[in-house]
């Protein structure tokens, strides 16, 4: 029996970690396309039926077989992780659980926004100039340094095993690697790059099954048809 329906669109960055958890816990989840009008205006939005269940019209969103609905990536990922009563993805004990939630919020509010602000001029979705691109890159640097300080000398962000903290942060970093985190960028950030590659390549290739092969660009790039929005 299907666990439920997970609504998203291809390569949506805030859905990556949710899809990972579903696969990791071997949940029988039906993936349903939903295209928010903010991201794909040409598709006309998600429709009234969707909005009646998920009032903000955002993805990811989950509807379980018994009719329970939840949206916002932090909540959906947490709910799916907890389907395994012995899960370690949420951390062990209150302090670790709190730290995991902090990293989830950090990804959505501190990591993804500056990455997306850097990507938009690159792909022609915002004005671009050398000064604009430099400012965008510098804004990303502040966030990357914060990750670097936390992960130095450790394999995982929280505790000694993989948690949602790692899944959120690596999912956010993956967006950067798709467009602006080039080989030269990786050379300048060896600690974060090594951490990203280690987690990205862990757990039976689950990330690759969601995002495709991990290719690092020689130069920043990407075009609108490849752009998957926020």
Language-model-derived ranges and their functions:
Residues 1-134:
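GST-like domain detector, emphasizing the conserved glutathione-binding G-site
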Residues 9, 164, 214:
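Short, solvent-exposed turn/loop segments enriched in Gly/Ser/Thr/Pro and often Arg
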Residues 16-19, 198, 202:
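Short, cationic motifs built from Arg/Lys/His that form the positively charged side of catalytic pockets
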Residues 27, 55, 85, 152, ...:
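Proline-centered flexible-loop/turn and helix-kink motifs
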Residues 81, 172-173, 210:
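Active-site-flanking alpha-helical
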Residues 95, 103-201:
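GST-like fold's C-terminal all-alpha helical module
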Residues 204-207, 212-214:
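Exported/periplasmic ABC-transporter solute-binding proteins
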Residues 213-230:
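Acidic/histidine-enriched, glycine/proline-rich intrinsically disordered or flexible terminal extensions
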């Amino acid at each position: 029996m299907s666990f439920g329906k997970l609504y998203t669109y291809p390569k949506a960055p805030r859905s990556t970690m949710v899809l990972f958890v579903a696969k990791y816990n071997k949940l029988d989840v039906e993936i349903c396309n939903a295209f928010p009008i903010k991201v794909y205006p040409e598709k006309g939005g998600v429709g009234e039926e969707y909005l009646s269940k998920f009032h903000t019209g955002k993805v990811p969103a989950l509807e379980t077989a018994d009719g329970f609905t939840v949206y916002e990536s932090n909540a959906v990922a947490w709910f799916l992780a907890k389907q395994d009563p012995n899960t370690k993805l949420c951390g062990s004990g209150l302090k670790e659980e709190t730290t995991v939630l902090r990293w989830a919020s950090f990804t959505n509010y501190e990591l993804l926004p500056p990455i997306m602000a850097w990507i938009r001029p690159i792909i022609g979705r915002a004005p671009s100039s050398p000064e604009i691109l430099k400012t965008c890159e510098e804004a990303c640097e502040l966030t990357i340094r914060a990750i670097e300080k936390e992960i130095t000398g450790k394999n995982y962000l929280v505790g000694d095993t993989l948690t949602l903290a790692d899944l959120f942060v690596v999912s956010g970093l993956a967006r950067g690697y798709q467009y602006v985190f080039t080989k030269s960028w990786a050379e300048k950030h060896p600690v974060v790059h090594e951490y990203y590659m280690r987690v990205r390549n862990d757990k039976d290739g689950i990330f690759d099954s969601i995002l495709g092969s991990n290719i690092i660009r020689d130069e920043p790039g990407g075009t609108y048809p490849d752009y998957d929005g926020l």
